[in-house]
């Protein structure tokens, strides 16, 4: 393991910040890519989510930011709003050593006018989806004249979503003299073609899936298709995870599994492609703040999910692609933490299990299912209040915290994460005081205005 301090160009303040964030040593992708990135070279990297790639390009682009220059100097393109939010959050943490650095996300599904207002003072860094960014470029609300670093994150996913033309159009607005960093989980011909068009003699780095595999205990259970839900309920009763993601291959199974867990008192939410954007946002917020213990999701819907301490991942169905299997289980061992991944295998999935074994070069750890016993509940510690207002009402976490602890009299220990979104604020409060907080906040005020509050269920 190589320490970040070996990178002589990182300033002491950044090294101190990395230490405070718990980043003590570099991941394989960081060790391979950062020297070239910090030297200003173009780099193309094939690596999975969870490999530390955000910090790799984040540390690089931050070294080129002049906070006294109020122009956009770095751009990160992402396939989804969720990934953009995740990347922006990580960049803000990495940028704590650099005061007054403005980072802005520009994604579809958010009011254009609100974004236009935020752009009156140009951000130093923009994290965006290609379509919405192109809208702003064409309307003249964003300028890339001072851009020195362009990053394309999950480039293969952007192509899958049909963003190829939009990416080309965006790049036409960028200066030719820039550093371009391209990250992709896979490397199809279309990605190689984009690299050839937009990069100059890039350093090619490939982090093999087996090299990047974190310290995860994998357990496999042979069961019938009909036996999967009872087995899942028993295993959740046994392990009692504070947070768990269950992966299903279809939206139908995703909802059926979620409903079955809730029926026995195991708090679960579902995340799949049929959800409206608002419902999707609320689901992600509620799971992240502890208002549900289990998230049942499809692979596409879970892209960009950022949960720091995920104790357990369950493959309700084995993925068709072994690379997807690695991507799934890697969510339970972020930043070097260990994790547990459980996979169910019905007889018709045996071939998929063999492919996973061959690819990862491991002997599968087959387990005996626990004996039939009573199902234990899995209750969430927190509940979520949704307050109308958010960024457009200039609400801050401190405003909400003050209302809850001052006017309503909640103990600070009863309040969890406060997430401020454009039109809403989501507040996690302990279940025991949730109804009291909701009822009293209904008639109360935040920043002098009466607020509309809902208790999400």
UniProtKB/Swiss-Prot annotation:
A motif (DEAD box) lies at residues 153-156. The lineage of its organism: Bacteria, Pseudomonadati, Pseudomonadota, Gammaproteobacteria, Enterobacterales. The gene is dbpA. This is ATP-dependent RNA helicase DbpA. GO terms for cellular component: cytosol. Its EC number is 3.6.4.13. Monomer. Pfam families: DbpA, DEAD, Helicase_C. It is an enzyme of class 3 (hydrolase). A motif (Q motif) lies at residues 3-31. GO terms for biological process: ribosomal large subunit assembly. Changing residue 154 to A: Shows accumulation of partially-assembled 45S particles. Changing residue 331 to A: Shows accumulation of partially-assembled 45S particles. Binds rRNA normally but is severely impaired in ATPase and helicase activities. Overexpression confers a dominant slow growth and cold-sensitive phenotype. It comes from Escherichia coli (strain K12).
């Amino acid at each position: 393991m190589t320490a970040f301090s070996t990178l002589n160009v990182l300033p002491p303040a950044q090294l101190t910040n990395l230490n405070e964030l718990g980043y003590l040593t570099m991941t394989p992708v960081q060790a391979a890519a950062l020297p070239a990135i910090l030297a200003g070279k173009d780099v193309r990297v094939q690596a999975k989510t969870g490999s530390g790639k955000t910090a790799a390009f984040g540390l690089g682009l931050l070294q080129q930011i002049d906070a006294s220059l109020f122009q956009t100097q770095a751009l990160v393109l992402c396939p989804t709003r969720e990934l953009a939010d995740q990347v922006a959050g990580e960049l803000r943490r990495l940028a704590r050593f650099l005061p007054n650095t403005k980072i802005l996300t520009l994604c579809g599904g958010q009011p254009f006018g609100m974004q236009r207002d935020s752009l009156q003072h140009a951000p130093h860094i923009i994290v965006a989806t290609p379509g919405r960014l192109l809208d702003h470029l064409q309307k003249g609300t964003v300028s890339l004249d001072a851009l020195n670093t362009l990053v394309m994150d999950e480039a293969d996913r952007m192509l899958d979503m049909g963003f190829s033309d939009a990416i080309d159009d965006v790049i036409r607005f960028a200066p030719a003299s820039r550093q371009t960093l391209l990250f992709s989980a896979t490397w199809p011909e279309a990605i190689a073609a984009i690299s050839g068009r937009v990069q100059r003699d890039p350093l090619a780095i490939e982090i093999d899936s087996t090299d990047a595999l974190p310290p995860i205990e994998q357990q496999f259970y042979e069961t019938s298709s009909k036996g999967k839900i009872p087995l899942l309920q028993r295993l959740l009763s046994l392990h009692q995870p504070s947070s768990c993601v269950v992966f299903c291959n279809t939206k139908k199974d995703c909802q059926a599994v979620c409903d079955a867990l809730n029926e026995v008192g195991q708090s679960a939410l579902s995340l799949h492609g049929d959800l409206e954007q608002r419902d999707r946002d609320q689901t992600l917020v509620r799971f992240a703040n502890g208002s549900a213990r289990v998230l049942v999701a499809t692979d596409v819907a879970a892209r960009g999910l950022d949960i720091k301490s995920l104790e357990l991942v369950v493959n309700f169905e084995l993925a068709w692609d072994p690379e997807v299997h690695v991507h799934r289980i890697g969510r339970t061992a972020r930043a070097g933490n260990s994790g547990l991944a459980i996979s169910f295998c019905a007889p018709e999935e045996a071939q998929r299990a063999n492919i996973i074994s061959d690819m990862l070069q491991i002997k599968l750890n087959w387990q005996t299912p626990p004996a039939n016993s009573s199902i234990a509940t899995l209750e969430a510690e927190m509940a979520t209040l949704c307050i109308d207002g958010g960024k457009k009402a200039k609400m801050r976490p401190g405003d909400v915290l003050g209302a809850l602890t001052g006017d309503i009299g909640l103990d600070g220990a009863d309040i969890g994460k406060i997430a401020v979104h454009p039109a809403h604020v989501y507040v996690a409060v302990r279940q025991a005081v949730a109804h009291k907080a909701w009822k009293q906040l209904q008639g109360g005020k935040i920043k002098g205005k009466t607020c509309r509050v809902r208790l999400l269920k």
